[in-house]
């Protein structure tokens, strides 16, 4: 595979994190995993040159229910419009600022499927942005840097377990599905990639916790991950009775389960509400 940044007459732009998927075997596997069906509401983040876009459109899009796509590169937008016409509804702009709720069906039921080969340079911020729309999402299938996927699905007690693990596992059921080598892209990235499936928990399955407070606790815990929690969470000792929770502060952040972090955030909420 060539290391050239040019593919199909387009130069991949580093500032957009562009690495175009070109391996048709991998593309077929991804589409089979997504299993798109006619009439579904689906949005692709970063369609690029349309490697995934084309088979997705073939399986689900009609002029009445097009595939939606969010793309920042205006050169690519022009090419995609010319190629797919009314079957692709393009939204020009940054996915980090896009209101994905605007594409969901009216009502409370989840209706939106989200897919994409996400730019690796913004993957974590984008995943956190998408969390705010999880209540209208059926599922998400993303190509990401393998290291990020490993952190997303990591178990407590492992080095990969992180703030990202806790916050995403609180909101989604996640599975790593397919490993994708660098040579599947043009230009090849310097890292391995993987496909992850993310299915939001239904409202009745979610713990009753303020995600902002959960994020506050988890961020503090992982702020110095090699230190014990009695140091990183020490400022909360005056407001949270850790002993009553059965929460051992003589551990590191990576050794605490998602459920335990939720319990601490709930205790913090109860204390602050009582003040």
Curated annotation (Swiss-Prot):
One of its GO terms (cellular component) is cytosol. The keyword Ribonucleoprotein does not apply. GO terms for molecular function: 16S rRNA (adenine(1518)-N(6)/adenine(1519)-N(6))-dimethyltransferase activity; RNA binding. It is found in: Cytoplasm. Pfam families: RrnaAD (PF00398). Its EC number is 2.1.1.182. It catalyses: adenosine(1518)/adenosine(1519) in 16S rRNA + 4 S-adenosyl-L-methionine = N(6)-dimethyladenosine(1518)/N(6)-dimethyladenosine(1519) in 16S rRNA + 4 S-adenosyl-L-homocysteine + 4 H(+). SUPFAM superfamilies: S-adenosyl-L-methionine-dependent methyltransferases. It is an enzyme of class 2 (transferase). S-adenosyl-L-methionine binds at residues 19, 21, 46, 71, 94, 117. Keywords: Cytoplasm, Methyltransferase, RNA-binding, rRNA processing, S-adenosyl-L-methionine, Transferase. It comes from the Bacteria. PANTHER family: DIMETHYLADENOSINE TRANSFERASE, DIMETHYLADENOSINE TRANSFERASE-RELATED. Specifically dimethylates two adjacent adenosines (A1518 and A1519) in the loop of a conserved hairpin near the 3'-end of 16S rRNA in the 30S particle. May play a critical role in biogenesis of 30S subunits. Belongs to the class I-like SAM-binding methyltransferase superfamily. rRNA adenine N(6)-methyltransferase family. RsmA subfamily. This is Ribosomal RNA small subunit methyltransferase A.
């Amino acid at each position: 595979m060539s290391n050239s940044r040019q593919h199909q007459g387009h130069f991949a732009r580093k500032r957009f994190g562009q690495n175009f998927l070109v391996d048709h075997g991998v593309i077929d596997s991804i589409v089979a995993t997504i299993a798109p069906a006619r009439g579904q509401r689906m949005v692709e983040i970063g369609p690029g040159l349309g490697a995934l876009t084309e088979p997705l459109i073939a399986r689900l899009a009609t002029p009445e229910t097009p595939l939606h796509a969010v793309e920042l590169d205006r050169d690519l937008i022009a090419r995609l419009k010319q190629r797919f016409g009314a079957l692709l509804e393009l939204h020009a702009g940054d996915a980090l600022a896009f209101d994905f709720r605007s594409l969901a069906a009216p009502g409370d039921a989840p209706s939106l499927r989200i897919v994409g080969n996400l730019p690796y340079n913004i993957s974590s911020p984008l995943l956190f942005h998408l969390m705010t729309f999880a209540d209208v999402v059926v599922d998400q299938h993303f190509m990401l840097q393998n290291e990020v996927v490993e952190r997303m699905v990591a178990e407590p007690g492992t080095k990969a377990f992180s703030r990202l693990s806790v916050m995403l596992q609180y909101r989604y059921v996640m599975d790593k599905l397919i490993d994708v080598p660098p040579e599947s892209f043009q230009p090849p990235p310097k890292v391995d990639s993987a496909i992850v499936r993310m299915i939001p928990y239904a409202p009745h399955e979610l713990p009753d916790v303020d995600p902002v407070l959960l994020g506050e606790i988890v961020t503090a815990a992982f702020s110095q991950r090699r230190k014990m929690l009695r140091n990183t969470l020490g400022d909360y000792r005056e407001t949270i009775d850790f002993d009553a929770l059965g929460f051992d502060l003589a551990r590191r952040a990576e050794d605490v389960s998602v459920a335990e972090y939720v319990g601490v955030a709930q205790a913090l909420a109860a204390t602050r509400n009582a003040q």
